[in-house]
Amino acid sequence: MNPDKKKRSNLIYGGYEKAPNRAFLKAMGLTDDDIAKPIVGVAVAWNEAGPCNIHLLGLSNIVKEGVRSGGGTPRVFTAPVVIDGIAMGSEGMKYSLVSREIVANTVELVVNAHGYDGFVALAGCDKTPPGMMMAMARLNIPSIIMYGGTTLPGNFKGKPITIQDVYEAVGAYSKGKITAEDLRLMEDNAIPGPGTCGGLYTANTMGLMTEALGLALPGSASPPAVDSARVKYAYETGKALMNLIEIGLKPRDILTFEAFENAITVLMASGGSTNAVLHLLAIAYEAGVKLTLDDFDRISQRTPEIVNMKPGGEYAMYDLHRVGGAPLIMKKLLEADLLHGDVITVTGKTVKQNLEEYKLPNVPHEHIVRPISNPFNPTGGIRILKGSLAPEGAVIKVSATKVRYHKGPARVFNSEEEAFKAVLEEKIQENDVVVIRYEGPKGGPGMREMLAVTSAIVGQGLGEKVALITDGRFSGATRGIMVGHVAPEAAVGGPIALLRDGDTIIIDANNGRLDVDLPQEELKKRADEWTPPPPKYKSGLLAQYARLVSSSSLGAVLLT
């Protein structure tokens, strides 16, 4: 037996002087034998706010069985969840990115307060997987994550749909393109049950990242929430934690710079969500790994996009699962020498060993995942932009638009609500560049996602004719000429704060540029005249967050 297996919990529960501590455990039915084993947490992101995590409390019981089979004593605790799809387009969305930090802090609080020897993380939706992985990196004790899985595709008049279709239908209805009955039918049928939004949006992207980083069991990201494979993976994940404790393998042994390069490569090859840029930066920060936006752009330029999934493509996560999930993508990348195969993972084996042992289904797959030699695009799905409007950087999801260059007049709005109203009132014209500012990490605060606005633009048929730039974020379901994470943000006096209606903005994804066609003298003059707006919140969580949060170019982490 590894003598360090109970190193942490012995400090809380070992020795005669800890008799009162043990009494609390015995009040819940634990025995001396239970307490003598490694005591581990099962961190479950769960509430009844939405379907993304609703099934995870049940799966936690299966994880506990796996832990017990490996010789551990499991203790379940929950972490809070914000359902982005419900908070979207409201003040509630300001709490979404904040919840990532709250999840990480919650795990730290419970695990450290009770001296757990390790933990399993169960998480679905957008911010809980990155929050859990941040906690894993921060605490650096044996731990493993299992993503909760996607919902199944919905159905509208015989066609598969996802929540993306409902958002875009709002814009189509406002334009008179569809009937109220069609909108209602989509609303009623887009999400048929438990699990996360069906396309390669933020949640499913972060599910892929759990595997690509080496923090989850191979193949565990793609099974739908209702698939029986979820039960198998839940059990095996609990059992795998006990092996990690036995061999002393910790997250920072896994989360090397090369592991992050692997994750970024999978992100770029799959055309995943721009939110993954923020989250990978934040996980790297917690792991003590120096990762920058330049690393993302460098890897994007060498990585072909080989996956055909919504929002830019045709297929949902359910379809990817049927052809092999993350291991299929990673095998193709490894064979092309685009992944580091020698990186260690939570199995105790390397990426290469895992992929050699993983059995892919023998089914046609090139309609969803192409060979490296015949990609959908020659470079990655996300491009980092810099220039006079974004000295620190900005992101564009090139996999979700055919337009790589756009030049047009600015239509400036100081909030998402102002912009959304203008779009619904059809005040946005072809070639315009909608600017939504003061929605950054500090300015929002909380860096809201602009899905209501972007979907309305697309729904009105302007997705490839109107551009949008913001210091806020985008949902993974966003498509069109959409540039986000513009840094520095408006609230700290970034160049986006200096824009005026009619200024000519140039988006050049081919060359990685985001500029305003103004002389430096004019920008300096406007900067001298600019005054910071007063804080939107003077007390409470959002006020605290605004004071501590860093730039989106650093992952919007809290600086301490």
UniProtKB/Swiss-Prot annotation:
Pfam families the record matches: ILV_EDD_C, ILVD_EDD_N
Record field: transmembrane: none
Taxonomic superkingdom: Archaea
The protein's enzyme class: lyase
Biological process according to GO: isoleucine biosynthetic process; L-valine biosynthetic process
Cofactors, names only: [2Fe-2S] cluster; Mg(2+)
InterPro entries per the UniProt record, alphabetical: DHAD_IlvD/Edd, Dihydro-acid_dehy_C, DihydroxyA_deHydtase, DiOHA_6PGluconate_deHydtase_CS, ILV_EDD_C, ILV_EDD_N, IlvD/EDD_N
UniProt keyword list: 2Fe-2S, Amino-acid biosynthesis, Branched-chain amino acid biosynthesis, Iron, Iron-sulfur, Lyase, Magnesium, Metal-binding
Pathway(s) per entry: Amino-acid biosynthesis; L-isoleucine biosynthesis; L-isoleucine from 2-oxobutanoate: step 3/4; Amino-acid biosynthesis; L-valine biosynthesis; L-valine from pyruvate: step 3/4
Reaction equation(s) it catalyzes: (2R)-2,3-dihydroxy-3-methylbutanoate = 3-methyl-2-oxobutanoate + H2O; (2R,3R)-2,3-dihydroxy-3-methylpentanoate = (S)-3-methyl-2-oxopentanoate + H2O
Molecular functions (GO terms): 2 iron, 2 sulfur cluster binding; dihydroxy-acid dehydratase activity; magnesium ion binding
Keyword Magnesium in record: yes
Ligand binding (Mg(2+)): 84, 126-127, 449
Cofactor note: Binds 1 [2Fe-2S] cluster per subunit. This cluster acts as a Lewis acid cofactor.
Active site: 475 (proton acceptor)
Assembly and interaction partners: Homodimer.
Family per similarity comment: Belongs to the IlvD/Edd family.
Protein known as: Dihydroxy-acid dehydratase
Organism: Sulfurisphaera tokodaii (strain DSM 16993 / JCM 10545 / NBRC 100140 / 7) (Sulfolobus tokodaii)
